[in-house]
């Protein structure tokens, strides 16, 4: 007998499918088939597709901001440098997929706006801790975030050696 799936199992599968195939992959039948179960299991955990989408967006906000911030704060004496390495070195398929989804869905757009605000506030906080005045920190946080978004949406990542040099230069630019 197969182990019973949890809502978390469905969310994890949904995030993988979203990152790989986009929003069109977020339907009960293909997800159930990929997990080797009936779609009844899906509806046991989620009232409808909208509830599933809301759960996916909530989880994305957790992993794409709060988890990263907690990890950076716990593991680094230089949180800005650690944040740059972590975010610019990550696979960004899910980031692109959620932003594509947000182009035509109000709930996804709200989630993207919230995560953008959270990330900007955190970057600004890190820059202020490095001694920058509030207005300068805010402006540089915005520039740094636009740089990240351009990188995230531009496709395949740079080779590791080149990326490391770019990150060092970005750090110098925003900290000067």
PLM regions: where:
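Short amphipathic alpha-helical elements of helix-turn-helix/winged-helix folds
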Residues: 13-17, 86, 147
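N-terminal intrinsically disordered/low-complexity leader segments
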Residues: 1-5
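Helix N-cap/coil-helix junction residues
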Residues: 23, 132-133, 176
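Helix-turn-helix
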Residues: 6-9, 13-51, 55
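Amphipathic alpha-helical packing segments from all-alpha helical-bundle domains
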Residues: 65, 90-97, 106-142, 165
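Hydrophobic alpha-helical connector segments
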Residues: 66-97, 144
């Amino acid at each position: 007998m197969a182990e019973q799936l949890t809502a978390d199992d469905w969310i994890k599968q949904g995030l993988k499918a979203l990152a790989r195939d986009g929003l069109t992959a977020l339907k009960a039948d293909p997800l159930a088939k990929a997990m080797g179960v009936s779609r009844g299991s899906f509806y046991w955990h989620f009232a409808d597709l909208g509830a599933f989408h809301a759960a996916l967006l909530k989880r994305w906000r957790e992993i794409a901001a709060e988890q990263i911030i907690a990890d950076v704060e716990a593991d680094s004496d230089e949180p800005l440098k650690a944040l740059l390495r972590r975010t610019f070195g990550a696979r960004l398929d899910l980031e692109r997929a959620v932003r594509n989804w947000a182009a035509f869905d109000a709930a996804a757009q709200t989630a993207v706006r919230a995560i953008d605000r959270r990330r900007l506030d955190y970057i600004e906080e890190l820059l202020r801790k490095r001694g920058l005045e509030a207005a300068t920190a805010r402006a540089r946080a915005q520039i740094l975030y636009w740089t990240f978004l351009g990188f995230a949406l531009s496709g395949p990542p740079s080779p590791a050696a080149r990326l490391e040099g770019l990150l060092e230069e970005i750090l110098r630019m925003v900290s000067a």
